[in-house]
Amino acid sequence: MIRRRRFGRAEVRIPAIGLGCYNLTADRGVDRDTALATLQRAYELGVRFFDTAPMYGDGECDELLGLAFGHLGADEVLIGAKLSGPPGERFGDYRRESVLRVFDRTLRALRRDDVFALQVHGFASPRDIPRQTAEWRALYEPGMAFEALLELKEQGACRYVGATNHNSVLLAEAVRHFPLDVVEIASHYNITSHVAPLTLLPLTEERGVATVIANPIGGGRLVSLETYRAATYLGAVPLDEAVGILERLMRDTGLALYELALLYLLHDPRVTCVIPGPRNVAELEADVGVADRPALSDEQAAELARIGSRMLARKVPTESDVEVVGVPLRPEWLATTT
C-alpha cells in the first residue's frame, strides 16, 4: 500500500508515489491502448497524483488523462497540470493571454473544470545558466505566467499553485517571490544529484511547500548498474567508488538499483511525492512495488547521498554562474567530476 504524506502546509495527504505521464505518449513510443491500461492500473494500485503538461505529446498527455479519468471527481484523481505557452515552443509565448488560452485547452482535454495543482512549467538550459535564469525571471513580470497562475487560483481553476524547473536554485527563488503551494524538481534530486537538498528543500520545509520529485530514476540511468555505468558520470566521488557503494547496498538490501533510487528519495520526509515515468503496466507495477519494500536506514541513505553531484549544471559552477542565480557560492557545490 502506498503511504500518504501531507501536501505541504495544506490539510490534505496524497500518496507518496504518483505518476509522471509524459512517457505514456506517442512521442515516447507508447500506443494509446498501453497508455490507458497503464493509467487504469495505476489507479487500481492506489496512485492518485498524475503529472501532465501541454508540452507532453503536444497535448496528448492531457487527452489520455481525460479519457482515463474524466468521469472521476476532483478528490478521486489529483491532476498536476502545467501552465505554459503553446506546445512545442519551450520558453515561447508565456504571456498571460497565451498561457490562459493554453490552459483552457488543457481543461477541455482533461474533461475537468479545475485541477488539483497547476504549476508554471519551466525548462532547463543546463549548459547556459545565465540564459536559463533570464528566461525564468521574465515569467515573474506583470502580464506573464506567474501573474496568470495566481489569478487562476483566485478564480478556483486550481486548488494549489506552484512551479516546475530542472534548476532547484531558480525554484527556490520563485518560492521566495510568490505564495506557492508546491514545487516540482527534476534533475537536481536523485542518486546522481544532491543539489536540491542543499538549495531548495530547506526553504520548502520552512515555508510548508509541497515538494514533488520528477525524474527520480535519473532519466533511466538508475534503472540498473549497466545503465548507470553507460551514462555520463557526474558524481561527487570517483565512479568506481560510486559503483562499489551501489553494489554493496543492492547486495545488502536485495533491491534493484531503481528501487534504491525511489526509496532514497522517499527516505527524505521533506519529499511529498515521487513521480516515476513508466511506459507500461509492468514498469508501473515495479515502481509502485517499492511501497511494500522496507525503508532505507539513515546510514544507507547517507551512503547514497555521498554519490550525488553538487553541481548546479553539467559543469563545475563558477563564481559568475552562482552570482547570476543570486545565491552565495558554497564549497560543497564545487565537486569535481571523474
Model-based region annotation:
Residues 7, 19, 35, 50, ...:
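Conserved, mostly hydrophobic/aromatic
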Residues 66-81, 141-151:
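Alpha-helix-loop-beta-strand connector modules within alpha/beta enzyme cores
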Residues 26-30, 53-62, 86-89, 96, ...:
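Acidic-and-aromatic substrate-binding clefts and catalytic sites of carbohydrate-active enzymes
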Residues 29-42, 94-109, 166-173:
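Short, acidic/polar
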Residues 109-131:
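Active-site groove signature of glycoside hydrolases
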Residues 1-78:
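N-terminal binding-site loop/beta-alpha segment at the start of enzyme catalytic domains
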Residues 123-315, 321-338:
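Beta/alpha (TIM)-barrel catalytic core signal, keyed to glycine-rich beta->alpha loops juxtaposed to Asp/Glu
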Residues 13-17, 46-48, 73-77, 112-116, ...:
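Short, well-ordered coil/turn segments that N-cap beta-strands
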